[in-house]
């Protein structure tokens, strides 16, 4: 069998060399977006994105990948608003385009051509653009005489050839230019044309339909281009409020074999092309007056975001006291959730009027507890509601009928104080109440525009700090927001196994164990935990505790030596837990009481709090003085209340540091509610704070004041966040001071022992953070009967309901396999950051990875079976579905015959080539 193993190694090398070339290339997809505030993640679904370079998007910020930016360039017209126009010789401007308020250029002028190449194209090339959309190629017809037309056309030909001569690798898309196409077709990447079915007339400001005569003329021109082997693109214009027509128009263009893009008149929205992006962002509107002005403490962030994350959506938080988004909503947002703090929260920014925008653009909107504005009869009627006049409401209120969606964790308890007499005229009622004198209220409903739960029937407060859901948030959000059935990016699992990560906060590093002969906590932790459980672990340090100019200068050499020994362990990655362990990260925070006393800021002599010193300074110290050769830290673990402001987060990102901590996942058998499961994190401006999946021993021991064995209850949290829904990975998270007491150390051992007995996939904390960030970046686009999935390749697991079917495993899908857990089917993606998901009712016959506790660094389907390179940090097992009769071959392990439908192989930690041969 030696020759088989040698052949395997050779084939794996081939896989790695061609890792980016899996599958048959799909037809070209193109998007056009000319406005500010572009939806970057969503645009990356398209192979080519044409942007206005004067706006905020550029190649440097866009990054590498299969999606490329093309720069919009007006050739035949000069826009007075652009800087380059002001530098033009007035003699080059020979007329006006009154409809678009621009000047027509003499494209036959050699001096203009040189200016255009040097001052327009060249700066864009230097900025990183390698593709250009050349617009206004036909504008010379507006100003040139008939006799001048040949010279104008020759000038355009020379200009296009000059671009390619200067930059042979430049890709050019022409907007029309049919009269010159034959002369320059060898220099053209694609040809576009506007208004095949629907147009926009700038003179009248009206959208309209294209006549059949005009359409046939344009189709004949495009057909001539296609015969030359050059792709063609049709750009049509539809009102942004008519998403259905947008979708239908794109489908009609696509059916003609033409690449479509259908959007609004200004190309300022996320339209529909060959692909339709399935938006994965929910806009969450909250009242900035709630939670002492910090969105972290709002009901929206604390309770609604986690279920929306589970359903596959990130949430963009927006304060109702600030101007509401003015950009086109359709295509950008999957829906809107409003959780106002009062009946007047939305009046300042006219939430009522903005709600009508959502309805017009067919973006579902949900209201929780209240609408955020006074609901008058006229507006209620527009929402399909009828307010019932009444003289008085006689208590008590009672439940007349309720859908099974209610009573999720607590039953609804009618309250006459929040009773709003109204009847649903259009939609599906979910909860109907009645007063003692017979007045009714449809307190919750699914409506044509979304849905609402009015009053105290969203959740109920059990105790001062405990809440429970009354409505099932998973089902309600799914139904009310019309969330489509599609693959869901999952941060809890990879290759079918639940993830395991561990990270340690630096508190107590220098403390001494309390038993006789006890050493420093750091030494005890290394001896009792780190050397025993050799799984990936992230160790953070409070640098003022170790530094020569810190708290313990006389002990610094000893403490630094211990830290170096820990960080040198192969399974340890380093992190910073700040310089002085700030309890508060924002100057306006005023935390008091036992938490502030327990999580204090270290008082370092002669030190004044400084964000740079806390973040980049502490990271630099660890890298320069403590990390071994070949290892660097780029992780920052928040301290204290773990509520960094936007400035602190910005500095962490600018230091190229991944960040984690915060959140509050404390679900247990004595606190059995998913309100105690935190979301993935929180957005603060453009920055994202990643929450720890689970909480540390501090909160299981009453802030380290007693019950020091309390961390053993983390096992309850692990179990309850795995079933009936897998909401979190397993995260063993603790402080160095757990090694100072026998009870806490035993609790820690128990948590580790439990984890070691489970089939888990061990990863580093940095890798989990990157998966969460990739969750936010992942774009999913519908392409006929399949979904295109793209991201940075850090998140590689998707989830679908079991009843949705099975993934098509044919070559080109980049789906390595699947496995079932609870009611879901988990799909495992290969490397590369791109996959195509097509579902079928048929069980696959080909072999596939059922589960694996290791990364896939390379993966390919072959006529004989599978080839892959796997890499694990601990010994792991690979299980192959449909493996009966197949052989598993590795260069370092024996050939194992398949004896059942599931064939498996156990491998030591490290990287391994593996082939599955079924012939």
PLM segments and residue spans:
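Catalytic grooves of carbohydrate-active enzymes
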Residues: 226-239, 483-513, 530, 609-612, ...
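Metal-dependent polysaccharide deacetylase catalytic core of the NodB/CE4 family, i.e.
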Residues: 95-108, 361, 368, 372-378, ...
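C-terminal domain-boundary segment and adjacent tail
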Residues: 259-276, 314-321, 480-494, 524, ...
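A glycine-rich, often tryptophan-bearing local segment used as a flexible ligand/cofactor-contacting loop or short
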Residues: 344-412
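Active-site beta->alpha N-cap acidic-glycine motif
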Residues: 76, 463-571, 614, 619-641
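Non-catalytic C-terminal accessory domains or segments of carbohydrate-active enzymes
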Residues: 268, 367, 754, 759-919
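Helical hinge/lid and interdomain linker segments adjacent to catalytic or ligand-binding clefts
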Residues: 33-47, 54, 293-375, 505, ...
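A glycine-centered loop/beta-turn motif at secondary-structure junctions
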Residues: 277-278, 310, 333, 363-364, ...
